[in-house]
Swiss-Prot record:
CDD domains: AmyAc_TreS. GO terms for cellular component: cytosol; plasma membrane. Residues 1-21 are annotated as: Disordered. GO terms for molecular function: alpha-amylase activity; beta-amylase activity; calcium ion binding; maltose alpha-D-glucosyltransferase activity. This is Trehalose synthase/amylase TreS. Disruption phenotype: Cells lacking this gene are as virulent as wild-type in mice, however also show a profound impact on intracellular and capsular glucan. It is not possible to inactivate Rv3032 in a mutant lacking treS, suggesting the joint essentiality of the different alpha-(1->4)-glucans biosynthesis pathways involving these two genes. Combined inactivation of glgM and treS results in absence of alpha-glucan.
Length: 601
């Protein structure tokens, strides 16, 4: 293990500070930098991402909250699992009124998590294991306690007076929707110090930055340079559609936003090649595709973007036992530039958002997946994957197979690989942000602190609680969900078609079965056939596979040969919520690869 994982040799620089009315920030040169991974401009296309909350993963300091040193301690587990990149939500200094998305200092780590030096040690330790790290960057707004905002409200004519969107009236930009409809009545709030209204698309304690001010643009680019200079592999850009405001528009997806993102991309490409920008834009695919930029250049804005509308439709398709919700949203998704990639997910740290569905579809999802009102949050459902699926192992495996085989780079949420549950009586989104369940011991093996000091209580549910569901028990059980997930990740890694293959839906005779081919062309190409039964009952399917006549389907987890494809429709029968992954090959089949020395099914 590298020395950086154990010790910090010099005192940390303590973030930003105000001096003479000017906010001074540290420089990346004040710190060490992490070991670099080999340059690969397309690494993100092949990567499996793993979202982990620093606070929730492991507590190395025994104070009741997870920390950066705790995450370093658990990197060997993530390497064993087989993920390629860690996504860290905000770990910056914050009042924590919105889970860290209310940033008080972009240049400082929240003290209970550690220091910037600890963060550099984390990136270095991850890189030495072949794991990359991207972090959240909240570009749209700050906390009201950020020194930029405090100086802006104190001195309207000072250097920060125009850092935020101020107005004498709250009647501007009236066409902009209110995003947090369950807590906010307006996008404007009155500041008693400056005696003006300030604009906020999210909570009232999160004032929006004014990107019409060139100084704000430069300040954010400086933040980007700082963290990339320390060695991280990219950013998830939070809430990017809302950076600019214009009268007569909904203040989303504006041309000015795209122009600024092109500036950011150029800085990244010129100064930090191989780093990645991932857009969080909860919009329809036709709008989101614009965040990739110019297709004639391969894309000149963000390298990746989340495909939000796909996620609820996976849940809808399985509950309705019909492929059409998935088929239709994929058909509505425009082509993307050659150097771009979708990010797809089942669950994350927020609610299962239902913004990108119709009112009728939203009512259906609430009725099916959120029967208790406490399961709802804003316009969505605050539940983890396993409880959403009633802890049905077949459904969980089917959803995992869809996540790993549909177009895009998959994002796993910490704990879903073992089937963790949630605690719905906790407020806001905390119910899906509980401590990772490592062992059946006290505090789920997450912390040695007194249980009363934990940032949130672990689940003690008889089905999902840590005594029943934990890494220690599942790691030693070959048939566990954890080992199933690990095996599927290993299979995916061996076949580039899953990462970069073209997508061709096959239709078929049965609407309850979703079948598609992922294919990389060429002499060294790779063709994978994926067949998914969305019904709880066994289903037959006849597929037209004539273009692969004389190919042999080889099932990928067991390496079993199925009958050769001929001119007639190819008949398969799938168990309820079952799936197949086949490689279509004309070559002689060899011995199956193994995962970790043994083949786990």
């Amino acid at each position: 293990m590298n020395e950086a994982e154990h010790s910090v040799e010099h005192p940390p620089v303590q973030g930003s500070h105000v001096e003479g009315g000017v906010v001074e920030h540290p420089d990346a040169k004040d710190f060490g930098s992490a070991a670099a991974l080999p340059a690969d401009p397309t690494w993100f296309k092949h990567a499996v991402f793993y979202e982990v909350l620093v606070r929730a993963f492991f507590d190395a300091s025994a104070d009741g909250s997870g920390d950066l040193r705790g995450l370093i301690d658990r990197l060997d587990y993530l390497q064993w699992l087989g993920i390629d990149c860690i996504w860290l939500p905000p770990f910056y200094d914050s009042p924590l009124r919105d889970g860290g998305y209310d940033i008080r200092d972009f240049y400082k780590v929240l003290p209970e998590f550690g220091t910037v030096d600890d963060f550099v040690a984390l990136v270095d330790a991850a890189h030495r294991r072949g794991i990359r790290i991207i972090t959240d960057l909240v570009m749209n707004h700050t906390s009201e306690s950020h020194p930029w905002f405090q100086e802006s409200r104190r001195d309207p004519d000072g250097p920060y007076g125009d850092y935020y969107v101020w107005s004498d009236t709250s009647e501007r930009y009236t066409d902009a929707r209110i995003i947090f409809v369950d807590t906010e009545e307006s996008n404007w709030s009155f500041d008693p110090v400056r005696r003006q209204f300030y604009w906020h698309r999210f909570f009232s304690h999160q004032p929006d930055l004014n990107y019409d001010n060139p100084a704000v643009q430069e300040a954010m680019i400086d933040v980007i340079r700082f963290w990339l200079g320390l060695g991280i592999d990219g950013f998830r850009l939070d809430a990017v559609p809302y950076l600019f405001e214009r009268e007569g528009t909904n203040c989303e997806n504006l041309p000015e936003t795209h122009a600024f993102l092109k500036r950011v991309r150029k800085v990244v490409d010129d100064e930090f090649p191989g780093r990645v920008l991932l857009a969080e834009a909860n919009q329809w695919p036709g709008d989101v595709v614009e965040y990739f930029g110019d297709p004639n250049t391969g894309g000149d804005e963000c390298h990746m973007a989340f495909h939000f509308p796909l996620m609820p439709r996976i849940f809808m398709a399985v509950r309705r036992e019909s492929r059409f919700p998935i088929s239709e949203i994929i058909a509505q998704t425009p082509p993307i530039p050659d150097m771009a990639q979708w990010g797809i997910f089942l669950r994350n740290h927020d609610e299962l958002t239902l913004e990108m569905v119709t009112d009728e579809e939203r009512d259906y999802m609430y009725a099916e997946y959120a029967k208790d009102p406490r399961m709802k949050a804003n316009v969505g459902i605050r539940r983890r994957l396993a409880p959403l699926l009633d802890n049905d192992r077949n459904q969980i495996e089917l959803f995992t197979a869809l996540l790993l085989s549909l177009p895009g780079s998959p994002v796993l949420y910490y704990g879903d690989e073992i089937g963790m549950g949630d605690v719905i009586w906790l407020g806001d989104r905390d119910g899906v942000r509980i401590p990772m369940q490592w062992t059946p011991d006290r505090n789920a093996g997450f912390s040695t602190a007194n249980p009363g000091r934990l940032y949130l209580p672990p689940s003690q549910d008889p089905v999902y609680g840590y005594q029943a569901v934990n890494v220690e028990a599942q790691r030693d059980t070959s048939t566990s969900l954890l080992n199933f997930t690990r095996t599927m990740l290993a299979v995916r890694r061996r076949h580039p078609a899953f990462a970069v293959g073209a997508f061709q839906e096959l239709g078929g005779s049965n609407p309850s079965v979703l079948a598609y081919v992922r294919q990389v062309a060429g002499d060294d190409g790779d063709t994978v056939l994926c067949v998914n039964n969305l019904s709880r009952f066994p289903q037959p399917i006849e597929l037209d596979l004539q273009q692969w006549t004389n190919y042999t389907p080889v099932e990928l987890t067991g390496h079993v040969e199925f009958p050769r494809i001929g001119q007639v429709p190819y008949l398969l029968t799938l168990p309820g919520h079952g799936f197949y992954w086949f490689q279509l090959t004309t070559h002689e089949v060899g011995a199956p690869p193994t995962c970790g020395g043994e083949r786990r099914l």
